[in-house]
Structure formats: structure tokens, C-alpha cells
């Protein structure tokens, strides 16, 4: 296990108490004694996960997992955390299972070559893992902790996203320059759409009607209208008849250069393309597919996260040591928050009062207050941290 050096620990131990000085009470809610909340940070360079105690804003521990952890997700129904380990280039990957109640590694699930992402359904029963090195999607039974199916995708699938109704899996195939759609009930390929160079991510609207995929090797977003079953009125006057609709390509939207990721507002009304080579964001109306605004945002924007009230977008800039704050209604930058070097992932605390920023180059996690939109403290992580997920729960 690779732990921070004594010098690093000393530096952070000085920063932490200073950060708490003058802290306003509304930044830290009063929790019951059995409340727990942790942030799990994957460290790709040290084969570990750093566990952060969110309630007390401190490092809880560091766990050894598999080789090259690259993604993490939490169960919506159990106190478990799932870490994707991409493994050696010529070997198989795995998914480590962490028991969140005692923060220990409880098991591992073998998958295929170079897994890079994980998506969990709303029941917490199934997970979908994109295996970029074997061009497959592993379907995992999380209760049994085993793979139950493998679906063939396009070349180098890097993101698998599940629609909110759990019926459609949208897969971005980066090297295949395509998007695959799977029916989750039958686990069969339903459609494939070509012409998205470097497909790298996907977001799906809350009503499961449409998916958007950034084409990171170009300057476009692919908008796909998802299939809809026929809806018939159950009784006179209850509803209008809605005809069935197949999956179809709706539009290719021009944005900035190399859009790596999309940030969707919680209400689904707008999304933001992070244009990494244009140092900008593009604001897209998800109903009309219109580009509402384009704004210079920072050095190599790679991740965005929208506040729960749909008002503020936070953007992690890999090539600068700050997070840009963007007011959505006003369509402009309103500030920046200091972070570490190489910011690459973002997550809110469950209260929304704290923002955690993963800094890949400096090997730390910056913590910011969202009420004042200001830097709060810096916590150490392992080498090359790259992803984060938070889990909150109450002990019995």
C-alpha cells in the first residue's frame, strides 16, 4: 500500500485546522451520531482507494484494491462501493467491492480486459462495466458478486450509461466512433449509430427520451431520440394515444473542439459540453437541440457538475489550478475556486454544501464551500487520483 509521505501528512495537518478557523455553521450540518458519509477516491498510480470522512472533512484510511483503479460507483440500496480496476494492459480487470460500514474490501468480481467505467441500476442489483480492451460490456449480479453476461459492443467502449427507467444502456465506443444501444431486458443490441469520432461519454434525460454523446475526436455532440413503446389510454379521457417510436439519430450539434464530457442539469433542460481543446463550454437546450451559449471557461476543461438547484455549473480545468464557477441563468463566469494541479473529477457532499475536487497531478483532493464558493482545505490522496464517489447512510 502506498501511503502519503510524512512531509505530506505534516503539510496537510497544518492546513486542516486553519481551514476550520472561522467556519460558518451552515457549511457543516448537525448529523445524528449514527450518520456516516464517505468519499471514495481511486488512485490509479498507487492501486489504492483513499477514503475521506466527509462529516469531519479528513482522511479516514487508504485501501489496497486491484491494479490501476480508474472508476468508482456506490450502490443506491446497499452500503457497498464498487471500484473498477483496469489491470495490466495484457491482463483481465476486476471490480473491488468495499463494505462502506467498516471500509474494508469485501471481495472482487473478475471482468474482462481494461474495464474503464461502471453503471449501477436503480435497484442496486445489476451493474454494467465497459471493458475497453475486449469490446464488451460485463453485466454483474451485485448480490451474487459475479458476471452473469457479456454483451458485445463497438471498438473500445469507454462509457456505459443506463437510462433512468432502466430500459436502455447507451454505450460510447471511442475507437469505433459509434454509439451502441442495448435493450436491458433482453441484453440484445437494439441499434448502433456511426459517425461520432472518439465517442467518450453519454448523458440521458430524466424522462429517458433522449441521449447525448460527445464526439471527443471532433467538435460535435450526437443527439439520439430513444425508442418509445406505444402508450394507449387505459380509460376514456385518461390520456392521449402515443405511437411507438424507434431509436433514431436526431442531430449532430456543433460545439467546441474535443468535447470530452457532458454535464446535465438535474432538471434535464440543458447540458454543457466541456470542450477540452477550445478551453470553453457550450450550452445546449436539450429540447430543441439549440446551442444557447459558448463561453471561454478555463485551461482544458474536463469535468462539469451542476448544483442541485440547476443554477451553478462547476468546471474542473486540468491545465489550471482552479475550478471555474459559471452562473447558468446569467450565462457567464462568476468566479473561480483554488484547487490542486490537474483537476479531473468532481463530487458534491450529500448536503450540497461541500464540493470535492480530485487533483490528478498533485495527488490530492481540494474541498470547497459551495455557499461562499471558496476554497476550504486540501486533503491528501494517493498517486494519480482520477475518480470519486460519495456514499451517505445511517448505521442501525
Describe every region a protein language model picked out.
Residues 1-21:
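Sec-dependent bacterial lipoprotein signal peptides
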Residues 23-396:
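Predominantly soluble domains enriched in secretory-pathway, periplasmic, or organellar proteins
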Amino acid at each position: 500500500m502506498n501511503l502519503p509521505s510524512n512531509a505530506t501528512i505534516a503539510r496537510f495537518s497544518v492546513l486542516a485546522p486553519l481551514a476550520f478557523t472561522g467556519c460558518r455553521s451552515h457549511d457543516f450540518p448537525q448529523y445524528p451520531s449514527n450518520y456516516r458519509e464517505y468519499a471514495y477516491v481511486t488512485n490509479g498510480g498507487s492501486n489504492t482507494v483513499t477514503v475521506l470522512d466527509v462529516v469531519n472533512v479528513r482522511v479516514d484510511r487508504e485501501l489496497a484494491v486491484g491494479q490501476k483503479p480508474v472508476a468508482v460507483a456506490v450502490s443506491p440500496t446497499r452500503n457497498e462501493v464498487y471500484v473498477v480496476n483496469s489491470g495490466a494492459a495484457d491482463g483481465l480487470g476486476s471490480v473491488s467491492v468495499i463494505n462502506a460500514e467498516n471500509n474494508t474490501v469485501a471481495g472482487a468480481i473478475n471482468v474482462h480486459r481494461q474495464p474503464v467505467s461502471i453503471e449501477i441500476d436503480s435497484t442496486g442489483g445489476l451493474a454494467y462495466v465497459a471493458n475497453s480492451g475486449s469490446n464488451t460490456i460485463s453485466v454483474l449480479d451485485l448480490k451474487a458478486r459475479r458476471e452473469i453476461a457479456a454483451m458485445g459492443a463497438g471498438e473500445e467502449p469507454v462509457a456505459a450509461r443506463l437510462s433512468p427507467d432502466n430500459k436502455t444502456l447507451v454505450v460510447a465506443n471511442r475507437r469505433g466512433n459509434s454509439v451502441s444501444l442495448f435493450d436491458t431486458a433482453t441484453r440484445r443490441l437494439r441499434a448502433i449509430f456511426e459517425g461520432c469520432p472518439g465517442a467518450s461519454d453519454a448523458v440521458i434525460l430524466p424522462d429517458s427520451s433522449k441521449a447525448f454523446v460527445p464526439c471527443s475526436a471532433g467538435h460535435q455532440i450526437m443527439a439520439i431520440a430513444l425508442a418509445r413503446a406505444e402508450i394507449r389510454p387505459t380509460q376514456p379521457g385518461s390520456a392521449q394515444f402515443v405511437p411507438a417510436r424507434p431509436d433514431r439519430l436526431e442531430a449532430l450539434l456543433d460545439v467546441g473542439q474535443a468535447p470530452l464530457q457532458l454535464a446535465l442539469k438535474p432538471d434535464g433542460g440543458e447540458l454543457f459540453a466541456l470542450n477540452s481543446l477550445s478551453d470553453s463550454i457550450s450550452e445546449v437546450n436539450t429540447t430543441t437541440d439549440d446551442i444557447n451559449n459558448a463561453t471561454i471557461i478555463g485551461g482544458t476543461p474536463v469535468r462539469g457538475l451542476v448544483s442541485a438547484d440547476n443554477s451553478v455549473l462547476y468546471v474542473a480545468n486540468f491545465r489550471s489550478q482552479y475550478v471555474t464557477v459559471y452562473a447558468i441563468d446569467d450565462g457567464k463566469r462568476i468566479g473561480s475556486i483554488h484547487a490542486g494541479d490537474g483537476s479531473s473529477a468532481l463530487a458534491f457532499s450529500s448536503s450540497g454544501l461541500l464540493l470535492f475536487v480530485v487533483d490528478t497531478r498533485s495527488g490530492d483532493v481540494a474541498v470547497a464551500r459551495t455557499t461562499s464558493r471558496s476554497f476550504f482545505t486540501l486533503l491528501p490522496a494517493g498517486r494519480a487520483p482520477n475518480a470519486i464517489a460519495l456514499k451517505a447512510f445511517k448505521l442501525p
